[in-house]
Regions:
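Catalytic-loop motifs flanking and including active-site residues across diverse enzymes
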Residues: 21, 159, 163, 217-221, ...
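Domain-scale recognition of functional cores that engage charged ligands
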Residues: 15-20, 26
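A conserved short coil-to-beta-strand element within the FAD-binding core of flavoproteins
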Residues: 35-55
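A short helix-to-beta-strand connector/capping loop
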Residues: 29-37, 201-203
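Active-site substrate-recognition segment that forms the wall
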Residues: 45-47, 63-64, 71-103, 107-201
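C-terminal lid/capping helical subdomain adjacent to the catalytic/cofactor pocket in oxidative enzymes
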Residues: 201-206, 210-274
Length: 274
């Protein structure tokens, strides 16, 4: 980590990997394709139901009927009855600071925005972001395995204390900075590290379970699902179809205790990177 870039002297090596946010990508595609398709937000699919030779996708306030479905919902594939007892639902946790003042930004120094990922996957990911809501720092660490796909506010708050410590270790000059937001986000893994890909029912194509590498593997799975749905022969489809199916997990009590014990052990091995 370059001190002149991020304002912290905790690490000495870094790798920068800029990326576009998916929302900007979707907006750009929508604007450049006129009325060829529509994007619906705040309309979660809560049920998929067979409707003659089509599928009906129900939302809280309406429904969509379609011939084909590309299902890119990661772990929530299990919520629709697919890959049952074969997907591991893992949460990671994050905190975001309040808007940094001019004085705090001066103390921090470094570039206007940056992102740092750890060499150990259990370590802390740290980002400095800037936008209409000001300059802020986001820190993400800690992991849990939760088959219910839900975590409590208490859990988020508890791990928030760990993020406060990680933040203070990296930025002692910002001891007066407070966190404004805390949250948990889902990851989906499989026991044998393979995707949940393919035609899972007639004309339902899954591009799920990215095993923690959503930007790369999710993009490939999405392209592959489109190729599969349009009967396009491609190297991506052939590669994705070459994987075994996700392995069945042990019974819940065993998988829950075992997975969380392994996570805890790996977090301990992360040392100062956490």
């Amino acid at each position: 980590m370059n001190p002149s870039l991020v304002g912290s002297e905790m690490c000495i090596r870094d790798r920068l990997q800029p990326a576009l946010y998916i929302s900007k990508l979707a907006n750009g595609i929508s604007q450049s394709n006129g009325n060829k398709f529509s994007i619906y937000e705040h309309s979660p699919a809560i049920e998929i139901k067979k409707n003659n030779d089509s599928w009906e996708i129900k939302t809280p306030t309406g429904s969509v009927i379609t011939k084909k479905i590309i299902m890119a919902v990661n772990g929530h594939a299990e919520s629709f009855g697919f890959f049952e007892k074969r997907l591991m639902h893992v949460f990671t946790y994050a905190s975001m600071t309040k808007k940094l003042t001019k004085d705090q930004l001066t103390k921090l120094g470094g570039e206007k925005k940056w992102g740092v990922t750890p060499s150990n996957p259990m370590g802390s990911t740290v980002r400095k972001i800037t936008g209409i809501n000001g300059d802020r720092i986001v820190i993400r660490n800690r992991w849990t395995f939760d088959p219910s796909m839900e975590v409590s506010e208490r859990r988020v708050s508890k791990f928030g204390n760990d993020q406060d410590k990680s933040f203070n270790d990296r930025f002692p000059m910002l001891s007066d900075v407070e966190m404004e937001y805390r949250w948990a986000g889902r990851l989906c893994l499989s026991l044998n590290s393979v995707p949940a890909f393919g035609e899972v029912d007639k004309n339902i194509f899954s591009a799920c379970c990215q095993n923690g590498i959503g930007t790369a593997k999710g993009t490939l799975a999405g392209i592959g699902a489109v190729d599969l749905a349009t009967n396009t022969d491609s190297a991506i489809v052939n590669d994705m179809k070459s994987y075994d199916a996700p392995k069945k997990l042990p019974p819940k009590p065993i998988s829950y205790l075992g997975a969380n014990a392994i996570i805890k052990w790996r977090e301990l091995k992360a040392g100062k990177e956490l």
